[in-house]
């Protein structure tokens, strides 16, 4: 383990952390479109929902925890209402979804058409992270992670393919763990590798429909999912040692890539996984 004392980046809140800044790119073509975002009650999903709404995108924001989703949507909409007149403002509609249930995704697509008369983008963000060694993981844990992380992406993409307008984009959340394994994360790593390959297959099959499919592969991002790392000095040091930029990423930095992939700037980009990991896959 390195003994290097990593300096704080400008604007950072602590060693290895950086204050998230909103992406500067506006992408005006997104205004007036409609997106579904799963796993949107907290973490990166909540940042995605608000970041899209700030660019005039109407969002069906879904989570298995409906109460938390309603609270997040209410807060985002209140901040939207406080923006100056003339500012692009989307609305966030909260919804409940169990991503392991195909019918739940169909309901989200129906809601998008009912509330906003169409569907343009789909973000398969919901996921779970069970920490368990291969020798100890239970069949129930394996089943749960595959249902949420893999089947959830598949079922969401199927619904998107059936209901999205031509020219639409699907973005799936993979992970640096798809290519860089860690102890105690076997099932999670396998699920995220599956997402990366599923994304490629979807891109090939849905190209005829005029739909693009890409994935984002985050590394250590400052969210609730990495709180255990941040609260353990030894774990944090190990994490920072494995990142060439020597800090955690912010959800806003992942949002910037998401906005690009949904925008016209990426209209010839499909079947790819974009890493947002500070270079950690190369260490």
Predicted regions mapped to residue ranges:
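C-terminal substrate-recognition "lid" of short-chain dehydrogenase/reductases
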Residues: 116, 154, 163, 247-276, ...
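Alpha-helical segment proximal to the catalytic Tyr-Lys
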Residues: 162, 204-208, 267
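Residue(s) in the substrate-gating loop at a strand-loop-helix junction
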Residues: 175
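Substrate-binding pocket helix/loop in short-chain dehydrogenase/reductase
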Residues: 133-134, 141-143, 239
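Active-site helix of classical SDR
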Residues: 157, 191, 199
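Short C-terminal tail/terminal secondary-structure segment
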Residues: 2-26, 180, 259, 270-283
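Active-site loop-to-helix junction immediately N-terminal to the catalytic Tyr of the SDR YXXXK motif
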Residues: 137, 181-189, 201, 226
């Amino acid at each position: 383990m390195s003994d290097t004392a990593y300096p704080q980046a400008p604007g950072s809140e602590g060693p290895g952390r950086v204050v998230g800044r909103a992406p500067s790119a506006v992408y005006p073509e997104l205004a007036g479109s409609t997106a579904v975002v799963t796993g949107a009650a907290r973490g990166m999903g909540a940042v995605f929902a608000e970041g899209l709404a700030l660019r005039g995108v109407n969002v069906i924001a879904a989570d298995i925890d409906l109460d938390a989703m309603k609270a997040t949507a209410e807060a985002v909409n209140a901040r939207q209402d406080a923006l100056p007149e003339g500012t692009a403002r989307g609305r966030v509609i909260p919804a409940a979804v169990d991503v392991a249930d195909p019918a739940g995704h169909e309901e989200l697509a129906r809601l998008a058409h009912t509330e906003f008369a169409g569907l343009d983008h789909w973000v398969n963000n919901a996921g779970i992270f069970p920490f368990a060694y291969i020798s100890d993981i239970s069949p129930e844990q394996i089943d749960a992670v595959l249902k949420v992380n893999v089947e959830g992406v598949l079922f969401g993409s199927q619904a998107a393919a059936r209901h999205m307008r031509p020219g639409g984009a699907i973005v799936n959340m993979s992970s640096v763990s798809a290519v860089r394994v860690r102890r105690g994360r076997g099932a999670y790593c396998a699920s995220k590798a599956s997402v990366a390959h599923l994304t490629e297959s979807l891109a090939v099959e849905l190209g005829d429909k005029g739909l693009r499919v890409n994935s984002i592969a985050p590394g250590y991002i400052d969210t609730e999912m990495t709180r255990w790392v941040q609260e353990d000095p030894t774990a944090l040091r190990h994490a920072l040692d494995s990142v060439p930029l020597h800090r955690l990423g912010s959800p806003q930095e992942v949002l910037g890539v998401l906005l690009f992939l949904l925008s016209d700037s990426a209209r010839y980009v499909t079947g790819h996984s974009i890493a947002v990991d500070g270079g950690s896959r190369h260490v």
